[in-house]
Curated annotation (Swiss-Prot):
Residues where N-acetylserine is found: 1
Originating organism: Gobionotothen gibberifrons (Humped rockcod)
Similarity-based family: Belongs to the globin family.
SUPFAM superfamilies xrefs: Globin-like
Positions that bind O2: 59
CDD domains: Hb-alpha-like (cd08927)
Chain sites annotated for binding heme b: 88
Alphabetized UniProt keyword annotations: Acetylation, Heme, Iron, Metal-binding, Oxygen transport, Transport
Protein's name in the database: Hemoglobin subunit alpha-1
Ranges of residues in domain Globin: 1-142
Quaternary structure note: Hb 1 is a heterotetramer of two alpha-1 and two beta-1 chains.
MF terms in GO: haptoglobin binding; heme binding; iron ion binding; organic acid binding; oxygen binding; oxygen carrier activity; peroxidase activity
Amino acid sequence: SLSVKDKAAVRALWSKISKSSDAIGNDALSRMIVVYPQTKTYFSHWPDVTPGSAHIKAHGKKVMGGIALAVSKIDDLNAGLLELSEQHAYKLRVDPANFKILNHCILVVISTMFPKDFTPEAHVSLDKFLSGVALALAERYR
């Protein structure tokens, strides 16, 4: 679970990177479909699933909106992300293993876009936070 120190580190990092969240989301989702091509199956209804396409940008923005929500609900991720968990479990039917894949891509993108802010301490706190988000999103799968 997240310590007080982890929560403070996540909030501090988010305050620095949130202005770039659309670009982070686009790059992370683009990276995910290239590095893990099996994830494209969730987007097969889109006419263009190439990195940086309009649909990828729009969904990347939506994903990062979810991350922003999670930061605001950091003290109770399960309750705060319940609606998103239900949507991913029942409507979208996303395999929860993919949350970990996308989390990894988000970490990679943030590390490359914000190398000075992505200290080892920020890295571990953000990784723990994103793992908590993935667990909260998987809550309705049980």
